[in-house]
Amino acid sequence: PDPTPDPTPTVITNADEIADEMTTEDGKYEIGFVTDVGQLKDGSFNQGTFDGVKLYAANHNLSYKYYMPANGDKATDEDRYDAMKAACDNGAKAVVTAGFLQEAALTKIAAEYPDVAFFFVDGGSVGANVAGIVFAEEQCGYLAGYAVVKEGFEKLGFTGGGGGTNPACVRYGYGFAQGANAAAAEMGKTVELNYTWQYGNSYSPSSELQALVNGWYNNGTEVIFCCGGNMYQSVAQAAAENDGYMVGVDTDQSPLSETIITSAMKGLTDGVQWGLAYVFEGSFADIAGKSTTLSAKENAVGLPTATWSLKNFTVEQYQAELAKIVNGEITVDNNSEMSNPEKAELSNIKVNFVG
């Protein structure tokens, strides 16, 4: 199938206009959404995915319900399984699960409910009735790193969630380093990059994370790419207190803080609608049992041009660099295990890996 996430023209385009919760007379909900760790309205991964569920449902007169696994950030595979089972028992024809941590629970539940269509966002296929949807985060990470160095920043930072085990976060960060390196090489300079996975295991804000990045800003770091759910709140706070900047992730996060100068975005909302259309139009078999990667070629990753605030690096320059990725002139390494870019021995970037 054509993996271009181009949902049918919709009547409602703003997910915020659609209620997060609805009640049906029979207690049945046709689309279930099982959240990743962190909050539902995280302004990032969960929210972007759920927006796709809400938009598809609202525009196709379908019922929907979200399920948060018990025990929050300490949710177990069993907690995730229970949430998925609740969705299935409540009549779901399609269940969208967010985040790579869902794999064990999803493998089990998919085998038990062969007639339900499951989506694994940020994961591969783990069953004949599971469609994986993954994104080329390394590409938008690259574009963000390239953009901030072209803008004139020379002291960068990266903080990510999942302790370096989340493949999507690893690709974002490694892409960011590669893009910054490419821009620095073109400009004949060397840039610095502080890099850490500390205090990111729960994808939540913390005083420890804020203190860490506060120290970075104090010591000259100018812009930090924060990649991990609600962690951005700690970085935005530190940035605001130090006249620093940050790069958002997953969605256009610029409305969340004035310190956010661009965002490495992936098309979660469109990607989910694209997938659900296969279920409710009767062609799920075309994407089931495998994983589809959505990249710059499918217009599924990039930087937000509608809220562009960079002064020295223009939208036109960005689009020229994006085109090179689309046409294959630039290949960004998508190594999902490169949690420490210092090991990549990039030519024009000095990585200070903090663990």
Q: Residue locations for each model-derived region?
A:
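A residue-level marker of the well-folded mature domains of exported/periplasmic proteins
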Residues: 3-355
